């Protein structure tokens, strides 16, 4: 692939790690953010120490506070901003773009107010004549490992397979590899909903339960993610892939996962507001729990783990009692997609 110009919107941990992947591939990378100290640090010290204490970025990776400058003459735009501001940033991008670009996102969540997936938001806010079909970049990927060039395999999903193949070529190298998929609904719901299950797995750890219990919540969590996804139109096979079970494993078993760490803290009895303040990063699984619970209620989808976590976070239920309560639920067959 020839050298491409790519704007990455959101210089957090994942946006920064992906900027390094693209820079390693010889592309022109521009990070955009709205925190002046962070932008200055990236440009002058070539570090982003809030997320990576010991990493020095290549000097060719630049950052700017000016969205127009970031978007000038780019071939592709990658959204890696928190779910709650995706629509706002997309509107700002739409007001500036003057040429067609490949639009990608690598965030994982559902919009709280509308319950919409992020690709839908981008489609609504950015006119079709200025963008490709949206490409979703998702899968098992700790930024802390990608930034040190550890082997990482993820998915590029789009309704337009050629757009997905472009992104596959854009990012893939000797340590970072993408597989294509056309099931956007499946890939996005898997990426968003696995954060809920990671909170549950972390809570079990915080409560002192062992590997049997953690394996159970991850496996049955995958079952309820699949039930909801299929109801929304996803292909159930997607959930057995990188963006499904792969992402669920990496997020539901690792201390690198902010959602797992948040769940572990909840299990230890810490208050949510203290957890969020101490972590200093967005915990997408907290907001996604509420959205997923509401969607499941509207559609009549059985999601006991999501319900237990929702009641603990939003209704003040004791998290141990909520989890143990699932052990007395009605008996069911293992393979039920409804």
From Swiss-Prot:
Keywords (A to Z) from UniProt: Cytoplasm, Lipid biosynthesis, Lipid metabolism, NAD, NADP, Nucleotide-binding, Oxidoreductase, Phospholipid biosynthesis, Phospholipid metabolism
Family to which this protein belongs: Belongs to the NAD-dependent glycerol-3-phosphate dehydrogenase family.
Protein name: Glycerol-3-phosphate dehydrogenase [NAD(P)+]
Record InterPro entries: 6-PGluconate_DH-like_C_sf, 6PGD_dom2, G3P_DH_NAD-dep, G3P_DH_NAD-dep_C, G3P_DH_NAD-dep_N, NAD(P)-bd_dom_sf
Top enzyme class: oxidoreductase
Catalytic activity: sn-glycerol 3-phosphate + NAD(+) = dihydroxyacetone phosphate + NADH + H(+); sn-glycerol 3-phosphate + NADP(+) = dihydroxyacetone phosphate + NADPH + H(+)
Residue sites binding sn-glycerol 3-phosphate per the record: 108, 139, 141, 194, 247, 257-259
Pathway: Membrane lipid metabolism; glycerophospholipid metabolism
EC number: 1.1.1.94
Gene: gpsA
Active site per the UniProt annotation: 194
Residues reported in the UniProt entry to bind NADPH: 13-14, 108, 143, 258, 282, 284
Transmembrane parts of this sequence: none
Purpose of the protein: Catalyzes the reduction of the glycolytic intermediate dihydroxyacetone phosphate (DHAP) to sn-glycerol 3-phosphate (G3P), the key precursor for phospholipid synthesis.
UniProt main location, coarse: cytoplasm
HAMAP family: NAD_Glyc3P_dehydrog (MF_00394)
Domain of life: Bacteria
One of the Pfam families matching this protein, by short name: NAD_Gly3P_dh_N
PROSITE patterns: NAD_G3PDH
Entry GO CC: cytosol
GO MF terms held by the record: glycerol-3-phosphate dehydrogenase [NAD(P)+] activity; NAD binding
Subcellular location: Cytoplasm
